A protein has these predicted regions:
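Extended polybasic, low-complexity segments that bind anionic RNA or targeting/receptor surfaces
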Residues: 1-117
Length: 117
């Protein structure tokens, strides 16, 4: 059975393909989580990031970041998708956010990054 492809699926498949080839266990784990069906991919609320992250941490969410809760810490959040409300709250808090592809290109070592599911 052929997988239905749309822009999001093509983007996802290309990211998973690149990350699976990476030798670092961190990126292989991210690829494994991204390869799951959408209904099984992590969805993390800002409330959870606020609770578990420290100031300046880099949090990687191999799924979607949702805007429930508030964020007071200046953290770097990396994810496959962000809700509009999450983007707005992070901007107001001074936190930075970027997509997984962009972060991977800038920081292949992923030192000090934390996977949050």
């Amino acid at each position: 059975m052929k997988i239905k492809t749309n822009a999001e699926n093509e983007r996802l498949l290309s990211i998973v393909d690149v990350l699976r080839k990476e030798q670092k266990p961190f990126w292989r784990r991210v690829a494994e989580l991204l390869a799951k069906p959408k209904r099984h991919r992590p969805e993390v609320n800002l409330r959870k990031i606020e609770k578990l992250a420290k100031e300046g941490d880099t949090i990687v969410v191999p799924g979607k970041v949702l805007g429930d809760g508030r964020l007071t810490k200046k953290v770097n959040v990396v994810a496959f998708n962000f809700s509009e409300s999450a983007k707005k709250i992070m901007e107001e808090a001074g936190a930075k956010y970027m997509e997984i592809e962009e972060y991977y290109k800038k920081n292949k070592e992923a030192k000090d990054a934390i996977i949050l599911t």
